[in-house]
């Protein structure tokens, strides 16, 4: 068979003309042990080779040795040949091995495609969350174009349709705006005072519910408290507002210092003396005087020790006593 008519040689030459990568070392034969080329010995000291040393050695080998290609012919095929290139370079250290390409139609390709589908779904949910938070923080109607610019979306994005289906988001088709429906529609000091005046009970308004539609309400609450217009219950740890009430009693700082000191100097009796003090003043205490309660002492039963009866034997008188049991 001539060289021009050899199909294997023709495929090899065509493959060489297309491939312009680094030289590839042929795979080791079956049964041949793989040498550890990652370890070198210099002056009796053994250490791992660096990536630069290995790259330099590969360059020298490519200049000395030809490219070895292993061509495997597929069984039962007369027209196609499979060309396999096996890289024998060990890249365990430094993580310098190149990333492997995923073959189309393989299991890895299907897993990658499924993963990309999940990422696209999660990306839509993330954009929906960002849009909701943006509308909530604004505290006022937001234009659709403003929301699209903020999220870098197009007008036909499906996130817009998902926003219209949310219960806490109101869409105005005439104005083209989105509005967050908070627990209390309060966004100014006057609206807060109006809400507190309209309360029938003294339960108070939760600041957590106020921040649902008005995240920046802390500054307004502090200012209204300074003006003695509202009453605020704060946490003990960081003094953040918890509940607010409308102050219908006037200025909170109008009490003279003299009365404040008088109130602080009043000493309350001890808990045990409180019922007797009330009786001396002609008042009936709601609780029983602890001094009138007789203490009931529990009688402790002492168990008597039983005396154990020991065995009485006459073994020391066996020679003196006589046995008359046969006469009975």
From Swiss-Prot:
The modification Phosphoserine is found at residues 52, 97, 106. It holds the Pfam family TFIIE_beta. Residues 32-105 are annotated as: Disordered. Residues 85-94 have a biased composition (Acidic residues). It comes from Saccharomyces cerevisiae (strain ATCC 204508 / S288c) (Baker's yeast). Keywords: DNA-binding, Nucleus, Phosphoprotein, Transcription, Transcription regulation. This is Transcription initiation factor IIE subunit beta. Coiled coil: none annotated. Disulfide bonds: none annotated.
């Amino acid at each position: 068979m001539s060289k021009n008519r050899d199909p294997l040689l023709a495929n090899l030459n065509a493959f060489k003309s297309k491939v312009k990568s680094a030289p590839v070392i042929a795979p080791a034969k079956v049964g041949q042990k793989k040498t550890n080329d990652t370890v070198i010995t210099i002056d009796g000291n053994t250490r791992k080779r660096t990536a630069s040393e290995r790259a330099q050695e590969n360059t020298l080998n490519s200049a000395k040795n030809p490219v070895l290609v292993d061509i495997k012919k597929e069984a039962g095929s007369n027209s196609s040949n499979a060309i396999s290139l096996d890289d024998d370079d060990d890249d365990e250290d430094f993580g310098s091995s190149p990333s492997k390409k995923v073959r189309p139609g393989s299991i890895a390709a299907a897993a990658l495609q499924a993963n990309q589908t999940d990422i696209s779904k999660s990306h839509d949910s993330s954009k929906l969350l960002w849009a909701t938070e943006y509308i909530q923080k604004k505290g006022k109607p937001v234009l659709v174009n403003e929301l699209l610019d903020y999220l870098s979306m197009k007008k036909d994005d499906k996130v817009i349709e998902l926003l219209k289906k949310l219960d806490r988001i109101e869409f105005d088709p005439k104005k083209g705006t989105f509005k967050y429906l908070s627990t209390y529609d309060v966004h100014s000091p006057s609206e807060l005072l109006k809400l507190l005046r309209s309360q029938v009970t003294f339960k108070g308004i939760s600041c957590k519910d106020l921040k649902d539609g008005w995240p920046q309400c802390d500054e307004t609450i502090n200012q209204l408290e300074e003006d003695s217009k509202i009453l605020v219950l704060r946490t003990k740890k960081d003094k953040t507002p918890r509940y607010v009430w409308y102050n219908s009693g006037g200025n909170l700082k109008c009490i003279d210092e003299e009365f404040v000191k008088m109130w602080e100097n009043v000493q309350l009796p001890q808990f045990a003396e409180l019922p007797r003090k009330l009786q001396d003043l002609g008042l009936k205490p709601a609780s029983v005087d602890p001094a009138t309660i007789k203490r009931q002492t529990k009688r402790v039963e002492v168990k008597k020790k039983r005396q154990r009866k020991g065995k009485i034997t006459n073994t020391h008188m066996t020679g003196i006593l006589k046995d008359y049991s046969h006469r009975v």
